[in-house]
């Protein structure tokens, strides 16, 4: 067969694969987040502690939904503004979920989509053990029914603010992580922020894109 026929054919076999892989990803709608709770903000701030021991009890899907809404939920629909401030509304953060024990959600790796407030299933299986190894074998990472991973694509903010954008991204990650921790308290859940991990090991375990860097692991469960 002539080369000019072979080349387009080989490209046709390769290119649709990525498109089909993306199209095949399962989208899971999350329950609508509530805008009022039984605990005041002041009480949540006063009660928050780092919790590293969790009972063997699953989370509910509506609880995970609420936690992710607190992290980066859209709070102003028309403009798309979110629960945590972002420099120039550049939104450099991505939120991944290593789910091990969540009712109505199979174990797997998921990514939160703020638009539409839904999860994209990236892979099936329990990723907590791999994260546990990457996080210097901290037991809370393995024992928590769910681990939220905050990753950052720094270039989204640096494209607008240059080197100063690095600081803005790190600030935003802190805002989001604190929102998650306070929301966990409001739900009578325990959480702890983990920064002691090998970045490359986390990236490999979750197959993160090359331009994304993990900043936080947040194990969450019932104390």
Give the predicted meaning of each segment.
Residues 207-223:
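A glycine-rich helix N-cap at a beta->alpha junction
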Residues 72, 100-102, 114-115, 151-155, ...:
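Solvent-exposed coil/turn segments that connect beta secondary-structure elements
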Residues 18-21, 202-205:
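Short linear sequence motif anchored by a di-proline
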Residues 20-144:
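N-terminal amphipathic, basic helical "cap/leader" segment at the start of enzyme domains
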Residues 48, 67, 95, 146-157, ...:
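Small-aliphatic-rich amphipathic alpha-helix that forms the alpha element of a beta-alpha
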Residues 4-16:
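Bacterial N-terminal signal peptides
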Residues 109-111, 147-149, 217-219:
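Conserved hydrophobic/aromatic beta-strand scaffold that supports enzyme active sites
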């Amino acid at each position: 067969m002539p080369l000019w026929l072979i080349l387009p054919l080989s490209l046709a076999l390769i290119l649709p694969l990525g498109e089909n892989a993306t199209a095949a990803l399962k989208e899971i709608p999350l329950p609508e987040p509530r805008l009022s709770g039984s605990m005041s903000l002041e009480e949540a701030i006063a009660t928050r502690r780092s919790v590293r021991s969790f009972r063997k009890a699953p989370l509910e899907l509506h609880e995970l939904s609420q936690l992710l809404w607190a992290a980066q939920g859209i709070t102003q629909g028309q403009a798309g503004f979110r629960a945590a401030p972002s420099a120039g509304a550049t939104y450099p953060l991505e939120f991944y979920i290593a789910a091990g024990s969540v009712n109505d959600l199979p174990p797997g790796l998921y990514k939160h989509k703020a638009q539409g407030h839904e999860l994209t299933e990236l892979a099936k299986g329990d990723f907590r053990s791999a994260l546990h190894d990457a996080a210097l074998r901290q037991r809370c990472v393995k024992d928590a029914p769910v681990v939220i991973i905050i990753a950052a694509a720094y270039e989204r903010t640096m494209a607008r603010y240059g080197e100063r954008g690095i600081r803005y991204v790190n600030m935003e990650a802190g805002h989001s992580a604190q929102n998650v921790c306070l929301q966990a308290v409001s739900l009578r859940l325990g959480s702890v922020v983990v920064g002691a991990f090998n970045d490359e090991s986390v990236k490999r375990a979750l197959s993160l894109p090359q331009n994304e860097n993990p900043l936080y692991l947040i194990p969450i469960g019932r104390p």
